Amino acid sequence: VSQLGYMVLAVAAGGALGYAGGMLHLINHVFFKDLLFLICGAVMFATHRDSLDDLGGIGRKMPFTLCMFAIAGLSVVGVPPTSGFSSKWLIYHALTQAGQPFLALLSLVGSVLTLAYIAKFLHAAFLGQPAPDLDDVHEAPKIIRVPMGILAAGCVLTGVFPGLALLPINGVLGEYGLEPLNVGLSGVLSGPGAWNATGMF
């Protein structure tokens, strides 16, 4: 639900930056939230548990799932070079440009709080001491892991190359009478909200 709030804020900010940020976050949300759901499913399938209190230490048994969770977690928090950063960056700038720096600050605080619950899940499920009756846990089958890998690739690709999503979005902005952003494969190239995702590293 919290991620939907970013989209609403982006639309409320208005302008090309706001609408582009909101639509980009919608796309990114599909990648990282669906990946998180699949990770939960993989953990439940492998452990036959549905409570965090009954887990612990399964990262040693499920390293692929742990890696997928790291990508999804960084993306939902908005850490570069994942996709969540690219859309949240635009939303922060859209709010500032709309004269709402306080809302931009609150949005940033929201990302910090998101980090808290991601860290809680990470520690409760994957880190710590493994439960003694989880010794036979192993990775989920390929039918679960392959979609996880595809979604994780989307989280990274739209983070490193946000133009993959922004270029089509830019076309939509023009259809609604908004001035398109100066967008390239690596991000917004000039003006408010400009950043070069590939140049950051």
Describe each PLM feature range.
Residues 33-37, 98-139:
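Predominantly late transmembrane helices and immediately cytosolic-facing juxtamembrane segments
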Residues 8-17, 87-105:
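Interfacial segments of multi-pass membrane proteins
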Residues 16, 58-68, 98-102, 142-144:
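Membrane-interfacial loop-to-helix junctions in multi-pass transporters
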Residues 2-52:
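Alpha-helical multi-pass transmembrane bundles of energy-transducing inner-membrane proteins
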Residues 145-166, 190-201:
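Glycine- and aromatic-enriched alpha-helical transmembrane segments of multi-pass membrane proteins
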Residues 73-90, 152-174:
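Alpha-helical transmembrane segments and their membrane-interface junctions
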Residues 104-111, 185-201:
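Hydrophobic alpha-helical transmembrane segments
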Residues 94, 164-195:
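Membrane-interfacial helical/loop segments at transmembrane boundaries in membrane proteins
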